[in-house]
Amino acid sequence: MAEEPDEKRGVSMKEPRKNPFFLIIVCMMLMMLSQTVVSFAIVLLNGGSLFQSGMTMEQADAMMLDIMFAHQTEILLISGVITIAGLWLMAKVRKSTFGAFTGITKPTKVPVLVLALAAGVAMSFWATIAINAIPWPEAMVESYVESSSALTTGKPVIDFLAVVLMVPLVEELLFRGVIYDALCMIVPAGAAVIFQAMLFGSTHSTMLWMLYSGLIGCVLGYVRKRSNSLWPCILMHSAFNGSSYLFNWFSEHYGEDSSTVTFVFIASAFVLLLSLYGISFRTTPKE
């Protein structure tokens, strides 16, 4: 039997949570504070020369940023573990289980998972080509490229664990899990999809990243709403992030071939739409 969408199941009504606004704020603070604390610890461990006399404030700031940039995926990996531990503690405080609190134990069907993987790969290629095709202001593009390049640190195992596994898991637990459910206590499920996407986009470091992350958050929120499960969202997000490495290879070999790029752009849009339609079809309640 197909999964029933949230608005028909009435999940938020059957599993009420107290103070949804407070819960959303705590979740956002948990993620930001964990990253801040880990970043500070990394700087302390790797920035011994910061304490040398004669260094100006500007030089110290630049060195701190360089250290955080070089260890970005380590920061994401460690702070992700802390965030998950924080969610586990929040569940205990609310006298719930981790699975029930985050929604990760809600099952889904294998075809939906396969479609989510396909959608993640297609969305990665389509979104990246679309971003490159739009004439954004140069400063906006430079800040985006600088921030995104920090996710490739020359430590492939750590980069993979952080970008492809930890980040999708943590962000889905937070935004399509706890925060989405909390929003459903306040607004209809469709509006909750939009609001969680806005919050998701706001956590990214540059304006261009915020814009496209917000749009991706809408798609992930739609999948969450339709499937009533986090697993399609986690797999889709993981495939999206992992495909960025595949796109780098594609861009290196075919980036100058406009006909190939155009074909991949159209094909990825078709696969994305077809996959989302398949997810919608597979999660429509049968008469």
What label would you give each PLM region?
Residues 1-101, 110, 242-287:
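N-terminal, membrane-interfacial amphipathic/helix-forming hydrophobic leader that caps
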Residues 21-26, 77, 110-118, 157, ...:
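Hydrophobic alpha-helical transmembrane segments
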Residues 30, 34, 78, 82, ...:
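Hydrophobic alpha-helical transmembrane segments of multipass integral membrane proteins
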Residues 32, 36, 40, 121, ...:
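Transmembrane alpha-helix boundary/anchor motif
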Residues 32-40, 197, 201-202, 208-266:
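Functionally important transmembrane alpha-helices
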Residues 51-57, 64-69, 98-167, 181, ...:
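Juxtamembrane helix-loop-helix connectors linking adjacent transmembrane helices
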Residues 170-195, 222-229:
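Membrane-interface helix/loop boundary segments of multi-pass membrane proteins
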